Amino acid sequence: VDIGFKIRDAINIYYETNFQEDPTSNFQWEFVLVDDDQTKNAWCMPGGKIAFYSGILPILKNADGVASVMGHEIAHAVARHSAERASTAMVTDLGIMALEQFILGQRLPQAAGYVRQFGLDLPFNRKQESEADYLGLIFSNLAGYDIDESYKVWERMKEDMGGSGPSEFFSTHPSPDNRITKLKEWIPLVNAKYPAIST
């Protein structure tokens, strides 16, 4: 919980310092640990509700690992990814329904799901995940955590999954290998541009 509030405070100072409106100013922050040792996951809902499952803690290993995932989850909330996904899904469904009626004169119940999953949702979600990875690095670094731990978390996650994990084409997330590569590229840039701030 302290890690989440420390990152929250760093975000507040970041936006204040840059004379920008803080997108988290109306959030009701809540950090929950779900007692489930089998689930290795964390998630964020709009408005600052963040949950970690106890099963992910051995992979995170330390406060810097927790901060890397916490920063990532908070970044989803800051970037309002949930709202983006909902509006994209609605527009896609309406467009597919119109095409089905115009071209075929009937609805194909599975069509919208397949088009969204393989044509729009997956790449869009991977893009959001990459954005959250980058913003998460910034937020964690501003809060004073060691962001080198971010790619180490993914190395441990990859090992836990028994290799590289699912094919990136079929996944909403970038592959662990791609994530590790990108995080290693971004870390020196983030360290130089967004040093830790005093909270």
Feature locations, PLM:
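Peri-catalytic and regulatory segments of divalent metal-dependent proteins
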Residues: 1-90, 103, 142-143, 162, ...
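Short helix/loop segments within enzyme catalytic domains
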Residues: 1-23, 109-172, 196-198
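Catalytic-site beta-strand/loop segments enriched in glycine and acidic/polar residues
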Residues: 51, 67-78, 108-125
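Residue-level signature of catalytic and energy-coupling elements of molecular machines
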Residues: 52, 132, 175
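Acidic/histidine-enriched alpha-helical segments
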Residues: 83-94, 148-158
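Membrane-active amphipathic alpha-helices enriched in small hydrophobic residues
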Residues: 87-120
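Beta/coil-rich, acidic/histidine-enriched accessory regions frequently appended to metallopeptidases
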Residues: 166, 170-199
